[in-house]
């Protein structure tokens, strides 16, 4: 079999091409865990990323870990002024957004009915619901047709876990946003939701071993997920691999929601 040099070059080009080559991504709440893993993978796949975080020290550390093609912008997704500053920086530096991953979130676990406070409720909905909505709304002027919006939900919005009333409701609202925005942006920008199950991140660090074992016991795969596994799902939704996918809820939960 004789293969021309041009065919070899074409094959090598396709096999070595990166899924997010020359794309601009914004990832909120990306100083640790799933969002940081996603930022790293996006850069590996050719993207330039803007990441946000509330604490400057953690943000600086994340930028250093990512290593290249990244700008860190200190800010709180629940504060409108911080969002305005974020997107002004993105506009000034890159002029556009190809991928938006609204990942910033907040939640108190282990808060059953009777122990919920007004502050806990307000803080959770301010970041998870209000923050998600205005993150997307303020990003839209910089997004072009063909762009991808990814929202971060949670298995808690699908299943009924004791002690998660407020957090679960906030994440169910995120799922609802995706349905509505898919209808509003149809044919232009894709909107999808990633719904992680129990992932081995700092969010679960404050739980007792008994509580952790309880979560793992209901996962058919018998383990917590890894941040990189969420990143891989985000890469799929960000890239052209999902060009005909919009409005979905991609459950990355080891099968928890199915049993």
Region locations from a protein language model:
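Residue(s) in the substrate-gating loop at a strand-loop-helix junction
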Residues: 154
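Short C-terminal tail/terminal secondary-structure segment
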Residues: 7, 11, 15, 107-110, ...
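Catalytic Tyr-X3-Lys loop
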Residues: 114-134, 150, 170, 174
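Alpha-helical segment proximal to the catalytic Tyr-Lys
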Residues: 141, 182-187, 243
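A short, exposed helix-loop element centered on a Lys and neighboring polar residues
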Residues: 136-137, 179
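C-terminal substrate-recognition "lid" of short-chain dehydrogenase/reductases
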Residues: 142, 223-252, 257-258
């Amino acid at each position: 079999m004789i293969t021309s040099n041009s065919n070899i070059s074409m094959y090598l080009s396709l096999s070595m091409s990166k899924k997010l080559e020359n794309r601009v991504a914004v990832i909120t709440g990306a100083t640790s865990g799933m969002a940081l893993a996603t930022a790293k993978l996006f850069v590996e796949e050719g993207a330039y990323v803007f990441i946000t975080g509330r604490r400057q020290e953690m943000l600086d550390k994340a930028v250093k870990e990512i290593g290249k093609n990244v700008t860190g912008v200190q800010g709180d997704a629940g504060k409108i002024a911080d969002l305005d500053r974020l997107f002004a920086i993105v506009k000034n530096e890159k002029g556009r957004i190809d991928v938006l991953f609204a990942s910033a979130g907040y939640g108190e676990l282990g808060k059953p009915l009777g122990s919920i406070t007004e502050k806990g409720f307000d803080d959770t909905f301010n970041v998870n619901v209000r923050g998600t909505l205005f993150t997307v709304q303020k990003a839209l002027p910089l997004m072009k047709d063909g762009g991808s919006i990814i929202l971060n939900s949670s298995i808690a919005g699908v299943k009924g876990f004791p002690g998660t009333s407020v957090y679960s409701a906030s994440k169910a609202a995120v799922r609802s946003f995706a349905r509505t925005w898919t209808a509003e942006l149809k044919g232009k920008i894709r909107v999808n939701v990633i719904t992680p199950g129990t992932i081995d991140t700092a969010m679960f660090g404050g739980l007792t071993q008994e509580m952790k074992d309880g979560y793992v016991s209901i996962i058919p795969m018998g383990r917590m997920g890894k941040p990189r596994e969420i990143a891989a799902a985000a890469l799929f939704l960000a890239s052209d691999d999902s060009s005909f996918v919009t409005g979905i809820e991609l459950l990355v939960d080891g099968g928890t929601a199915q049993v």
